[in-house]
Amino acid sequence: MRFLYDSYSDIGKRDKNEDSFLVCEREGALIAAVADGLGGCRGGEVASAFAVDELKQRFEANAALDLGKALEEINSGLLLKQRELGMKMKTTICAVLINAEHTVAANIGDSRIYAFKDDRIVFQSTDHSVAQMCVDLGEITPEGIRTHEDRCILTRSLGSKQDIRADITVLDNSSYDSLLICSDGFWGGVVEQQMCSALEQSETPGEWLGTMRKLCGAEINSDNDNNTAVVINIKEG
């Protein structure tokens, strides 16, 4: 199994970039993550960088790590860092851990993981937000999340309390061929049909991401958010 991937992070029109990301290979496994520091709290960029740095260290020490447990430990570490620095810094995080047997997808907050098969979405992580709650209650459609007034109000984030747990989904490696991991600043500007169309028309991860980045750039003026994405293609052999 081979991994082909590309990534980027853009400040948008904000004063600073509070997004962080990770892509790392080791012993035939790959881990990738995107974290989006909460802008309403001091130290969002510190929180997101802390989360991905800690995750990378754990992966480098053990490529077969328990992703859910690792995120629980990172959450505890972030709470400790809050006390040390005197800042209530918080962050979203979504991550995938791919090995020969399967793929583990984990998310906390409203950064997203998409899995694609034959240019169609076969899996999408669920946001932890007030807008997603409205979807669950049947008050708005999933597409309505992008324009909902409470889209940025999260119901779960790293650093918000001690007993935070990620949503964990295990994917069979044969069930998908491509992955997209991104912050809300990215998926807010690129709708799902555009993701699929860009993938269908691309030969490489770089082409796929480049097309979507242009689409995101065309829409980003609406909220000026940081936007970050990692794309991965899985190849046999």
Annotate the PLM regions.
Residues 1-237:
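PP2C/PPM-type serine/threonine phosphatase catalytic domain
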